[in-house]
């Protein structure tokens, strides 16, 4: 990928220069491993909410999502019921898509139902693709891989 220099002279992916939010995300999070069950659960949920929307929309609402979904603590989110769904549907700070809200609650419940000794981190690690050369263009980045399809099947199997 062609890197562009920002106002500070640092080279970055072209998309990172589109906004301050993207710039901060690029410099501090993008391409870096995520550790811890709550952090992994947050990323999984936010990626789900992003479907059909731009990532910048989710980044700008991320703090509101964290508040609305109890810091993405799977134990707390799994306990959400109809009253919480109704409240979330009225929260203009998040993406108010009932199917995505219910999927997030369902995913928290599925995470808690994993067999003893299993974790979201371990499940994701089992499906990590082998190391490959860094992509040079956007066309080099596949929309899906054998590993991503396998992970998707396993996640669906767990609920």
Predicted region positions:
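HhH-family (HhH-GPD) DNA N-glycosylase catalytic core used in base-excision repair
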Residues: 1-159
